[in-house]
Swiss-Prot record:
The gene is Itgb5. One of its GO terms (molecular function) is integrin binding. This is Integrin beta-5. It is a single-pass type I membrane protein. GO terms for biological process: cell-matrix adhesion; integrin-mediated signaling pathway; stress fiber assembly; transforming growth factor beta receptor signaling pathway; wound healing, spreading of epidermal cells. Integrin alpha-V/beta-5 (ITGAV:ITGB5) is a receptor for fibronectin. It recognizes the sequence R-G-D in its ligand. The keyword Magnesium applies. It comes from the Eukaryota. The lineage of its organism: Eukaryota, Metazoa, Chordata, Craniata, Vertebrata. It is found in: Cell membrane. The keyword Glycoprotein applies. Keywords: Calcium, Cell adhesion, Cell membrane, Disulfide bond, EGF-like domain, Glycoprotein, Integrin, Magnesium, Membrane, Metal-binding, Phosphoprotein, Receptor, Repeat, Signal, Transmembrane, Transmembrane helix. SMART domains: INB (SM00187), Integrin_b_cyt (SM01241), Integrin_B_tail (SM01242), PSI (SM00423), VWA (SM00327). Mg(2+) binds at residues 147, 149, 247.
Amino acid sequence: MPRVPATLYACLLGLCALVPRLAGLNICTSGSATSCEECLLIHPKCAWCSKEYFGNPRSITSRCDLKANLIRNGCEGEIESPASSTHVLRNLPLSSKGSSATGSDVIQMTPQEIAVSLRPGEQTTFQLQVRQVEDYPVDLYYLMDLSLSMKDDLENIRSLGTKLAEEMRKLTSNFRLGFGSFVDKDISPFSYTAPRYQTNPCIGYKLFPNCVPSFGFRHLLPLTDRVDSFNEEVRKQRVSRNRDAPEGGFDAVLQAAVCKEKIGWRKDALHLLVFTTDDVPHIALDGKLGGLVQPHDGQCHLNEANEYTASNQMDYPSLALLGEKLAENNINLIFAVTKNHYMLYKNFTALIPGTTVEILHGDSKNIIQLIINAYSSIRAKVELSVWDQPEDLNLFFTATCQDGISYPGQRKCEGLKIGDTASFEVSVEARSCPGRQAAQSFTLRPVGFRDSLQVEVAYNCTCGCSTGLEPNSARCSGNGTYTCGLCECDPGYLGTRCECQEGENQSGYQNLCREAEGKPLCSGRGECSCNQCSCFESEFGRIYGPFCECDSFSCARNKGVLCSGHGECHCGECKCHAGYIGDNCNCSTDVSTCKAKDGQICSDRGRCVCGQCQCTEPGAFGETCEKCPTCPDACSSKRDCVECLLLHQGKPDNQTCHHQCKDEVITWVDTIVKDDQEAVLCFYKTAKDCVMMFSYTELPNGRSNLTVLREPECGSAPNAMTILLAVVGSILLIGMALLAIWKLLVTIHDRREFAKFQSERSRARYEMASNPLYRKPISTHTVDFAFNKFNKSYNGSV
């Protein structure tokens, strides 16, 4: 389903809901307006007749009617019906080139000033155009993280200025470069604060024992066209060391944005702020860990030495404050971060307008190409931002980009080339009158541009006849003021001509206070006095009408809210604000909430009803019908186009391929970038067993950017003998390797056992002993020769 029918469906839904209401009800007469100003507020089609004698003298509402009805009833020439209008006050033509040295004569947006006069409920429309001119001056401020982890990056950008200037001067002849650095707040727990670390926080760190003291932000080089000064300043820098992983870079970003004179931002130049880091940032409320409870004031705090003096006094800035100050000073922030933190900073870009994020290599060697890519991305996009929009104004945008197709609800164009013009239709509507403030203004500005459109707003909330007041007029019996064909009675008097006093007995005319015979006086919600109803007051709202039959609180509710908070209650029926329809105004006609990430309405698988997707494709589900397991995937749908292009030698304008490639912008390349975060990479095998590769990205305008290889990748057929030899050789090598491993293990085991034996042997200790079974061959006997026969003694020896 294409996008236009989805938008058309929403419009038809609104018309279908509105036609029965207009056909069956004249909202002007049912609104029970009691004055010209009230009549104008009911509906932009309502008009007031200021003729003295007109219509039913008892019915004020007969004066408030459609203009055609008033003319038909004889009120010609005295009708109050102001219309909304637009007047262009200043409209300088767009420039084609940023030719001057300062760029002060370059106009990239037209018109520059418009005055609109608005009647509540009625839209007025004006056109504006934006162009990215060629050769526009560029100011680039390089803001670098000098914490210890960025040491190798610092080494690699020593000559960055020269190389970067060479590349940028291919894009603009007027280029200037500046430099600043940051680490973190010099307080605990963000930095090392012990006395021994004050002069050298790297003490005790073996890998890099010497570094400079920690600091918040230092502005080192104002914007200059002397790139040698940049190189010289970079060569002077040394890294420092902080304590925790996050860095204090957002402090530095804010100072670089608001210290315009110190940095040297030119008024008429494209402002680029390159933020390089390898870690996450501290944000608002982190400062409370260090006792910093004062929120950041968003002001410049650089001293004479260009150092940030409030680093240890105020908290880190919030994302909202950063976005405000960057937009206020027309600065495009480029996050150059390492791959592991890419998604975090990618999410930041959705919260901070005008920011882009690129992946920085670990050693910053790709920084030049990164900056060139970011510059090209910024120059290829135009997005309108609204400043100081009054609360009672509704704005509606329709973008017409380079393809000439209108996209309702969109205020951004992408994929532009330098010199392309993006057109926007802006519709302005006042929901109500602002009260005392009769005139207001707001500004439309493309993100990152100095050009802007100032819109002065005046409200048509008063009638011309109100200027001719007649106090104590004879037309009002001397008891009131005559204005716009009516009498405004003084206190205590009633009647169309103020002819009655309150409290007079008019019982004979009480039937004039009944809406119909048998109905209660003044619908039971008022008193009949002087032949007319005086309605009671109610804590719920206003009771009004000739017979007090109407009120402002008896309309349909949604979740307990009258008219869903998107309309006004008039006599039992909701009058919806612009952008809402339905009996209780709960149905939004805005289709922006139905846009999928690829920019398509309901992922091209459903329709947008009341701001929500109703999936019509079988199997599709999700908030924007983005999930569909049974649907053909995007690669399959794009494959038909690619195959047709290959068959017809890459000619997308070929009649045969026109149907398959009607929404694709074709780019032929020799190699596909596989790490592109935004692109979807697709493969398929051709009939010749070759691999065809292509990638695509969905553009916001509903088209696809299709990047296709010029030739499929075809590998040569494998050699059977080579495969056989490789298999046999592999088996032999594996077998020999296993045998060698086995032999090695056995040898190691034997050596361990032998060493164990030797160790035990050396520790052994033996005791001397004789064998009890062993007898010596020689025996010795001693004889006593003084042997006495009787005394059995012998003394001697043998």
